[in-house]
Regions:
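Active-site neighborhoods and metal-handling regions in enzymes and metal-associated proteins
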Residues: 1-206
Length: 206
């Protein structure tokens, strides 16, 4: 599996501290009577903890799992190879780093509790394990997805700047394409590679 270091996603980019996000979502868990929520989607894990990585091409995610608790604490399950010094310094009180091998034991510790899990994203093994431990499973959407979609002012500005950079790269590509296509012999792969090259030149494409 990919083993790139996890890095902080700064407040200047996220617009909200990770602790604030956890606290907001924890209130929702308490309102539902849930002890915890199982977070398995990479984008949710990264958004909730304000971290990023390079485990996937062109997508700044680090692959792992998390459990968010109703007291606003969380457990983040990442391989040791992903524990960069920057990550350690970034994660403050309330977040416990654990090995992926400990995920099953963490599920077992929720025996008898109400636990939220998303059937659209969590693996069957998660539901099977919780069921065996007599947990009360609340099947509901990943609690990160809706808040993550509601962008704050900092995120909106970041999106605007990203579109400006990408728009400039696309404009350069179209200018090149107008000449290259007229000469003939151009393939879709040629065009795709050239466009990626213009986008890489922005310095913002992993």
């Amino acid at each position: 599996p990919p083993m790139t270091p996890a890095m902080p996603h700064g407040l200047n980019l996220s617009g909200e501290e990770a602790a604030s996000k956890r606290a907001r979502l924890a209130e929702g868990l308490k309102a539902r009577g849930a002890r915890a929520a199982i977070i398995t989607l990479a984008d949710s894990v990264c958004w909730l903890h304000n971290i990023r990585g390079s485990d996937l091409p062109h997508t700044p995610f680090v692959l792992g799992f998390a459990i968010l608790y109703s007291d606003a604490s969380s457990e983040l399950f990442l391989d040791d190879a992903k524990h960069s010094p920057e990550l350690i310094a970034h994660l403050v009180d309330g977040v416990r780093l654990r090995a992926p091998e400990e995920f099953v034991a963490a599920l077992d510790a929720l025996a008898g509790h109400a636990v939220l899990a998303d059937p659209a994203s969590a693996a069957h093994a998660v539901f099977d394990r919780l069921s065996k431990q007599k947990a009360r499973i609340l099947r509901a959407p990943d609690p990160c997805q809706l808040p993550k979609a509601c962008k704050n002012a900092v995120e909106i500005e970041g999106m605007r700047q990203a579109h400006i950079r990408d728009g400039a790269a696309l404009t350069r590509f179209l200018a090149w394409f107008a000449g290259a296509a007229a000469q003939g012999g151009l393939t879709e792969i040629d065009a795709a590679q050239k466009l990626e090259g213009f986008r890489r030149a922005t310095g913002c494409l992993s």
